Amino acid sequence: MVAPMASKIEVSIVDQNPVVRTGLETLLVRDGRFSVSGIYASGEDLLAALQTKPVEIVIVGWSLPDMTGGDVLTRVRKEKWRTRIIIYTGERSSEVLRTAIKSGAWGFVAKTEEPQVLLEAVVSVARGRLSLPYVDIDLLNHDPLESLTARERELLAALANGWTNLQIAARTGISRNTVKYHLKNLYDKLGVSNRAMAVALHVSINRNEHR
């Protein structure tokens, strides 16, 4: 049996989807263990509020209109705020989980989970415990670029430079079909499904390496 909290847990919410924001507010308020102190549609709105009104716990969507949940985590850590972040996301990629954990998330809950999972994650984090899904430690230490061949690294750099498949084929001396074949292998190794996601991952890793 879960011991009662001495006082209500103060929670803020930030998500780009108004339906999610309203649903989370209703879920938390009806439970009785929580109070909702702020609801925000963007990362900047949340960060501006935290500068003047610190909050104990924030439930943060990963994909925000102006930044990612990872950016929020980085800013909170940089400012040394005592706010504890729970990432609540529909993103299922291992890279998102890896980034969230390495950036200091206290909790990570998929939007496909039952509501009770999120509520118990909030309680655990409020009590000073991490609430993270099981993850192999090798995953956290794994650099997804390490498994790429020289050709795949070359292709990733070309994608980051905005090259089309035709330009890549012309400049590397391989056929367009061969380019497509290498790109499919590249996406599989990176755990992404398209070039936009591959470029975003490439930029994120390079940015982290130069911090």
Swiss-Prot record:
Keywords: DNA-binding, Phosphoprotein, Transcription, Transcription regulation. GO terms for molecular function: DNA binding. SMART domains: HTH_LUXR, REC. Residues 10-126 form the Response regulatory domain. The modification 4-aspartylphosphate is found at residue 15. SUPFAM superfamilies: C-terminal effector domain of the bipartite response regulators, CheY-like. Not known. Could act on the sgaA gene expression. This is Probable transcriptional regulatory protein SgaR.
